[in-house]
Amino acid sequence: GAIDTPGEDPHHWGFEVNIAGHAAGGLASYLGEENYGHTKDGKAVSLMSVPGLEKYWGTETFVTEALTLEAIKALDKAKKYNQPFYLYMSQYAIHIPLNKDMRFYEKYKKKGMTDHEAAYATLIEGMDKSLGDLMNWLEKNGEANNTIIIFMSDNGGLASESGWRDGKLHTQNYPLNSGK
């Protein structure tokens, strides 16, 4: 739902748990060091500041990893109480800003990518790792054959307009001629 309406709160849509979800379509920062877009005293710097991940503030935990860790905790809780679960996992990746996920950044720089392209690649790899971690949890806990996974996105490859991309473009949106 839109900002400042009841629909912006996932609890109003029937969700029992909300981890870092809000009405903004993106985020202010992927970086725990930047408190995901909050000042040190907890004030949001913009409507895009990510709520609900305060325990990761000031750490090197990229928001993609923080969301994955929290999702796994929710799955662990459902498993502990032998409850069925519905996990709606909505990553912020690969939305702008193009913050670098340092877990993967050097790998792409060594391949000769520009800073922008390497940062973009780290967002994709971080999301891939997140999905892999969730799939591993399902396998380890005997839930893989009893779980339906639907993977979708509202984003195409990042647009090629000046300022968004540089160097060789590693994504394309054919037959469309721009992004999203």
Language model features with spans:
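Formylglycine-dependent
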Residues: 2-85, 91-100, 109, 118-121
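Histidine-centered active-site microenvironments of extracellular/periplasmic hydrolases
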Residues: 5-14, 96-100, 136-180
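Structural recognition of the beta-strand scaffold that forms the well-ordered cores
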Residues: 17-20, 85-90, 123-125, 148-152, ...
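Substrate-binding rim/cap in mid-to-C-terminal beta-strand-loop elements of soluble/periplasmic
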Residues: 26-32, 37-49, 132-141, 166-180
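Flexible glycine/proline-enriched surface loops and loop-helix/loop-strand junctions
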Residues: 50-56, 112-117, 151, 173-177
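A short linear-motif detector with a strong N-terminal bias
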Residues: 53-54, 65-67, 128-130, 153-156, ...
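A long, amphipathic alpha-helix that forms part
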Residues: 62, 66-79, 106-147, 164
